[in-house]
Every structure is written in structure tokens, then in C-alpha cells.
Amino acid sequence: MNTKMVTLPIEYSDKNVTAHGGLSLLKRFIDKIGIIEALDGFDFPKPGSNRGYDPSEIILSFWLGIWTGASRYIHSDWVRYDKVLQEIFGLKLMPSQSTYSRFLNKFSQKKNNEIFPSLQDWFFQKLDIGKITVDFDSMVITRYGDQEGSAKGYNPNKKGRNSHHPLLAFISQTRIVANAWLRPGNTAASSNCVEFMKETFNQCLSSKDVGLVRETKGFTLKR
């Protein structure tokens, strides 16, 4: 089979270009739902100096790294050189990997409890899906190495391995996680189930009309 070679023109330009122009659609989306303005209303950890980035800028920049394929902090650095993408999202400068790690390390369990249930509720207010079905479940996640918070406990698939034993709440209609608590692997299935359900209904889903609740055995053992 003969293949005809096509001569493609090569041109040079002094204009900035990006391989991620399609993300402009995401920019329109976040502008439409007003999520950046909503983030400004939450008490996120503040920078250590007046020259630091606003929390909403750090979060938006972190999203850009994830949307362009980053799976490690260091990968987010490539977005710092994409001036077109920064212009699309209205960012004058972008944080370094150390800024992300410092910001995320400031979150404590107390701070998480103050912010994320209310943030989840804000998100679910945007979903017009009528009455919802909420599924509660717990699962075992096997961990390898020395993962923070992991411990040896009930693990039917990898006996003797460290694990986490999280509690999860899902919206059945959308398959979206409504709430999640990460627990050590040596935690009993029913531990903190009632408190978890209260937070889910009273905070994360306070604006939704719940029509049906389904639970696994671990949740029913507590009552």
C-alpha cells in the first residue's frame, strides 16, 4: 500500500498559544453557577502574609492542574507557563506546588467539619432532581506502605494488611457522593454511623427532599 506524504505548512507566531483552549467551556460553567463567589464566603485557611494568594485563587489554580492531567503537586507547575489558560481564567499568577501543599496542610478535622458539609449543601442546591434516594455504606480500602490513618482491622480481601474503613453516603439518582468520613481500618462498622447520618441530612443535604434512605447492615446495627 502506497502512502502519499502530505506536506504540512510550518508557521511561527509570537502569540501565546495553549493546548487547553477547550477549558474555556468550564470557565463559562463556573461563572454561571457562581462557585468562585461562593468559595469567597467560606472560612478557608488564610495565607501567612498579605502577599499570599486568596484561597479561591489557590483552589481554582489547583483545579486547572487536575483538569489538565496533574496527578501530583509537581505536575501542576506546567500550568504556570500556560499564559493563555491563565488569561482565560483571570489569573495574573499561579501558585507553586509548595503553596498548594502548605494550603492543604492547614486543614484540620475541625476546619473540615466547618467548611465541607456547608459546601456540599451549596452544591446540591444547584441540582434540581426532586426527591432523592440516599444510600449509606461502609467499605474497606486496603493500603500498602505507611498511609496516614490506616490500621489493621477487618479486611476480608487482604487479611493482615492496613486499611481504611470509610463511611459513605451517595445520591442514587446522580451517583454523586453526598458525604464521606475516612476512618482507620480497625474501626467497627457501626462506629459513628448515627453522627455521620445526622451530618449528612442536617448539613450536607439540608436543602434536599429525601424520599428514601437505604443502608447497609453496619448502619442498622447501631439502632
Locate each region found by the language model:
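A short acidic (Asp/Glu
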Residues: G145, L221-R223
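Alpha-helix N-cap/loop-to-helix initiation residues
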Residues: A189, T220-L221
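Dynamic "connector" segments at or just before major functional cores
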Residues: M1-D209
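Acidic/histidine-rich, metal-coordinating catalytic segments
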Residues: D137, D209-T220
